[in-house]
Amino acid sequence: MPVVLAAAVLCLSPSVHDGDTIRCGRERVRISNIDAPELPDSPKCQDRRRSYAWCDFAAGEASRVALVRLLSRGRVMIERLGTDPYGRTLATVSVGGVDAGDYLISQGLARPWR
């Protein structure tokens, strides 16, 4: 199914899954420019087959909490950029002009995604 790309849109009911994935209603949104540490329930860390996974669970929780706090500061905007292999929307996420990915990187709670 093709994804219609649009200008930034308001996310009315954001919820945070982990440091780099949120939900806007039913839409799963992956913050496009970062990789955040995994949480303990991540299959990437359970089976240890994915060497690229960042399996620092304390940092994963800190990243999730920081994103929750950032998103609670104001209107959450998403700018859709495409989809990832898991069917999530890839997007830039911002609050009050602050890019969520850049913010988490600046706090040491995420790394740039390549």
Locate the predicted segments by residue:
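Small beta-barrel nucleic-acid-binding modules, primarily SNase/OB-fold domains
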Residues: 2-114
